[in-house]
From Swiss-Prot:
Active site: E334
The protein's name in its UniProt record: Snake venom metalloproteinase atrolysin-C
Compartments, as annotated in UniProt: Secreted
Cofactor(s) listed: Zn(2+)
Broad class of the protein's primary localization: secreted
Family: Belongs to the venom metalloproteinase (M12B) family. P-I subfamily.
PTM info: The N-terminus is blocked.
Role, per record: Snake venom zinc metalloproteinase that causes hemorrhage by provoking the degradation of the sub-endothelial matrix proteins (fibronectin, laminin, type IV collagen, nidogen, and gelatins).
Keyword terms: Calcium, Collagen degradation, Disulfide bond, Hemorrhagic toxin, Hemostasis impairing toxin, Hydrolase, Metal-binding, Metalloprotease, Protease, Pyrrolidone carboxylic acid, Secreted, Signal, Toxin, Zinc, Zymogen
A Gene Ontology biological process term: proteolysis
Subunit structure: Monomer.
Tissue/organ expression: Expressed by the venom gland.
Catalytic activity: Cleavage of 5-His-|-Leu-6, 10-His-|-Leu-11, 14-Ala-|-Leu-15, 16-Tyr-|-Leu-17 and 23-Gly-|-Phe-24 of insulin B chain. With small molecule substrates prefers hydrophobic residue at P2' and small residue such as Ala, Gly at P1
Length: 414
């Protein structure tokens, strides 16, 4: 018989209904303080890894016990994941950090078939989960008790700006036949049998983003990893695995002319991607994260139906919110345009969830792709047969102990 050791952390829950607190996600006016209890079954004497492949947490939400099951997102990084930044004199510095033992998870709530979760466990639990159709955010509290976390609804984060924020889209392809309303087709992901596809994504953070986060590469790295973990979760409903293959940070200066005129910035980014980035890093799509305020209340811009195009498989996204979930929705939206998805109606709902391809971003109970978006995507696959998203970006398992720095000896090396 295998003996197991139950590792438990924390016990209590203290709701502060009606209180207000400033968190990393913003000023929250209604939240609960919770102490998640971690339960891990390990063989007796086993060495506990820093980040386990599977974890289970117990906590209370609205006074009710909840069991959160988490599984490490092993699709999050491609086999050749790299990071690039620039020295003060402009030299490219590229590394291949080991990401095998990363701290990003996806999951579900026990006994809730419609639940989802995307969580970072790098420093406490941070992310979101959907429980009984409601979206909750969780993040650590900076208290003397290091196990304290805040749980709150997205709607309880105070709005910084009431002005409507919109997405731009450039028309770069035409349909050969009129699209039927997906509502008439009564489609869902299971019925459509959407084929498995894989997107190797590059995220580029401009110099304003670098300065916004106090020139801290680690802060930007963590933010982008959390955003892509959310994107990966959204696209699972379409049978698409989104893996981050490169993070580039323009730490010295911008490599293109970044302007508020979003279309000009998009065009400049397209030229740079084709003539520079693609020559040194194989990838399927690149998204520019910029801290400049784009024109006409635009949060992002992307060409329509351009996935796998060597120049136009791109998008730009304004770093508009401290809430990584909303940034994930925005970047997933722009990526959707690259996959042929047009805008949904401004009031589009999928059940109780807001549609990701709405033209404007608003806070909702949860976010999903609509049936129309699924049909647009399926039509794009049939008409254009994009080849770059067919290959699966498998992880390479190291076969030896680490050597100096982050380098690993791979199979065949000496």
């Amino acid at each position: 018989m295998i003996e197991v050791v139950l590792v438990t952390i924390c016990l209590a829950v203290f709701p502060y209904q009606g209180s207000s607190i400033i968190l990393e996600s913003g000023n929250v006016n209604d939240y609960e303080v919770v102490y998640p209890r971690k339960v891990t079954a390990l063989p007796k004497g086993a060495v506990q890894p820093k980040y386990e492949d599977a974890m289970q947490y117990e906590l209370k939400v609205n006074g009710e016990p909840v069991v959160l099951h988490l599984e490490k997102n092993k699709e999050l990084f491609s086999k050749d994941y790299s990071e690039t930044h620039y020295s003060p004199d402009g030299r490219k510095i590229t590394t291949n950090p080991s990401v095998e033992d990363h701290c990003y998870y996806r999951g579900r709530i026990e006994n809730d078939a419609d639940s989802t979760a995307s969580i970072s466990a790098c420093n406490g639990l941070k992310g979101h989960f959907k429980l009984q159709g409601e979206l909750y955010l969780i993040e650590p509290l900076e208290l003397s008790d290091s196990e304290a976390h805040a749980v709150f609804k997205l709607e309880n984060v105070e709005k910084e700006d009431e002005a409507p924020k919109m997405c731009g889209v450039t028309q770069n392809w035409e349909s050969y036949e009129p699209i039927k309303k997906a509502s008439d087709l009564n489609l869902n992901p299971d019925q459509q049998n959407l084929p498995q596809r894989y997107i190797e994504l590059v995220v580029v953070a401009d110099h304003r983003v670098f300065m916004k986060y106090n020139s801290d590469l680690n802060t930007i790295r963590t933010r982008v990893h959390e955003i892509v973990n959310f994107i990966n979760g959204f696209y699972r409903s379409l049978n698409i695995h989104v893996s981050l293959t490169d993070l580039e940070i323009w730490s010295n200066e911008d490599q293109i002319n970044i302007q508020s005129a979003s279309s000009d910035t998009l065009n400049a980014f397209a030229e740079w991607r084709e003539t520079d980035l693609l020559n040194r890093k194989s990838h399927d799509n690149a998204q520019l994260l910029t801290a400049i305020e784009l024109d006409e209340e635009t949060l992002g811009l992307a060409p329509l139906g351009t996935m796998c195009d060597p120049k136009l498989s791109i998008g730009i996204v304004q770093d508009h919110s401290p809430i990584n979930l909303l940034m994930g929705v925005t970047m997933a939206h722009e990526l959707g345009h690259n996959l042929g998805m047009e805008h949904d109606g401004k009031d589009c709902l999928r059940g109780a969830s807001l549609c990701i391809m709405r033209p404007g971003l608003t806070k909702g109970r949860s976010y999903e792709f609509s049936a129309d978006s699924m049909h647009y995507y399926e039509r794009f696959l049939k008409q254009y047969k994009p080849q770059c998203i067919l290959n699966k970006p498998l992880r390479i398992d190291p076969v030896s102990t680490p050597v100096s720095g982050n380098e690993l000896l791979e199979a065949g090396e000496e």
